[in-house]
Amino acid sequence: MSLAEQLDSSLRYQPFGSVWYGEEDAELLERLLSFYPRKPPERILDATVNGGRFWRGTRRKVIGLDIDPRHQPAVCGDNAVMPFRSGCFEVVVYDPPHIPNQGRDRSKDFNTRFGLGDRSTKEHGYSFAHTYPAFMAEAYRVLEDEGVLFCKIADYVHNHRYQWAHIELIHAGQKTGFTACDCIIKVRKGPIIDPNWKVAHHTRREHCYWIIFRKSHRCE
């Protein structure tokens, strides 16, 4: 490589930090799509599209899948049994619910805000971790080799017990055959706080994670 090529390469390199500050995911997701795929992706699946907030203002062509027809997704279906042929996507995006149930406050629509279409019961530890393996198997199937899976995941405290959702997700991905390649910590402006809370036993969550998996034995 010539000196000119080396200089040009160094000028093109833009550092991508592991901590992201901001409320919106759309800009961060655009950075992920520009940074991790081997080539500019054209076949993208959002497997938990909900109202499509990740893609507002984007020019990318994205197929949205959701189990709830009220969100009017392009494809209505279960991401644990996807209606797609194997190896047809370059990127899959996944944002599972992390809050186990609506609670008593019915003034807020948790389905729209958090994708909460179903409850998680005591049998499952008030967690959705039991849904990760089936999704991971399907994501692995529909991704092409070297394809990338972007997962947004938040840990949760329920009944004074910390639920390590991001660790459960990583384990599920690795058992399926994915390589967990990177992690972005997304920090919000402030924690979610209920004015009725009087006593705290854990710190309040001000962050979530974007975990990057690749359908490969290597990351680079």
Regions found by a protein language model. Give the residues of each.
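Class I S-adenosyl-L-methionine-dependent methyltransferase catalytic core
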Residues: M1-E220
